[in-house]
Amino acid sequence: MGKGDPNKPRGKMSSYAFFVQTCREEHKKKHPDSSVNFAEFSKKCSERWKTMSAKEKSKFEDMAKSDKARYDREMKNYVPPKGDKKGKKKDPNAPKRPPSAFFLFCSEHRPKIKSEHPGLSIGDTAKKLGEMWSEQSAKDKQPYEQKAAKLKEKYEKDIAAYRAKGKSEAGKKGPGRPTGSKKKNEPEDEEEEEEEEDEDEEEEDEDEE
């Protein structure tokens, strides 16, 4: 997400979030000088929400709908600042970058190290794998290097086909439409992106060994 970007639209609120906000305002009016125990307050709100009828909840659901419309409208007009990660979304259909010979070696030997040393941290595991890899002879490394070369060759063919397909589809569509509506799936995309980044970072750490 665009951390620190003051122009980024405020996130949309759920019907329950509006309900909690209303409860908080009511509590402040009744007890202006008393502090709120957040955990206890949240529990009470949750219990109260469960006992409410659909008719009582509809007021908050309407508020959530109008806030969602506001958010979608603002996101369509929102332009992320240059360098913002969300400006270049990863296409889930894009071919995945091939692993290196070392990464293939790690994938094969990591489970063994984890079973032998269950308390070992990720960093220490990566370090141990790096040491093991450096101790391998050129002959022992060869199967991994051959497999990595084949995967790289396949990736290069796949990415060329993917890019060619992207260009032809862009030509058919003509001038691009605003893609702000895609932002609805932003939290899920972020999680995927973070997972992929964790993998990439681990691979980079291992390559440095």
Swiss-Prot record:
Residues 9-79, 95-163 bind DNA. The modification Cysteine sulfonic acid (-SO3H) is found at residues 23, 45, 106. Residues 187-209 have a biased composition (Acidic residues). The modification Phosphoserine is found at residues 35, 100. Belongs to the HMGB family. The lineage of its organism: Eukaryota, Metazoa, Chordata, Craniata, Vertebrata. The keyword RNA-binding does not apply. This is High mobility group protein B2. It comes from Homo sapiens (Human). Pfam families: HMG_box, HMG_box_2. Reduction/oxidation of cysteine residues Cys-23, Cys-45 and Cys-106 and a possible intramolecular disulfide bond involving Cys-23 and Cys-45 give rise to different redox forms with specific functional activities in various cellular compartments: 1- fully reduced HMGB2 (HMGB2C23hC45hC106h), 2- disulfide HMGB2 (HMGB2C23-C45C106h) and 3- sulfonyl HMGB2 (HMGB2C23soC45soC106so). Acetylation enhances nucleosome binding and chromation remodeling activity. The modification N6-acetyllysine is found at residues 3, 30, 43, 90, 114, 141. PROSITE patterns: HMG_BOX_1, HMG_BOX_2. GO terms for molecular function: chemoattractant activity; cis-regulatory region sequence-specific DNA binding; damaged DNA binding; DNA binding; DNA binding, bending; DNA-binding transcription factor binding; double-stranded DNA binding; four-way junction DNA binding. The keyword Transcription applies. Coiled coil: none annotated. Disulfide bonds join 23-45. Keywords: Acetylation, Chemotaxis, Chromosome, Cytoplasm, Disulfide bond, DNA recombination, DNA-binding, Immunity, Inflammatory response, Innate immunity, Nucleus, Oxidation, Phosphoprotein, Repeat, Secreted, Transcription, Transcription regulation. Residues 165-180 are annotated as: Required for chemotactic activity. GO terms for cellular component: chromatin; condensed chromosome; cytoplasm; extracellular space; nucleolus; nucleoplasm; nucleus; perinuclear region of cytoplasm. Residues 52-150, 162-209 are annotated as: Disordered. Both, HMG box 1 and HMG box 2, show antimicrobial activity. It comes from the Eukaryota.
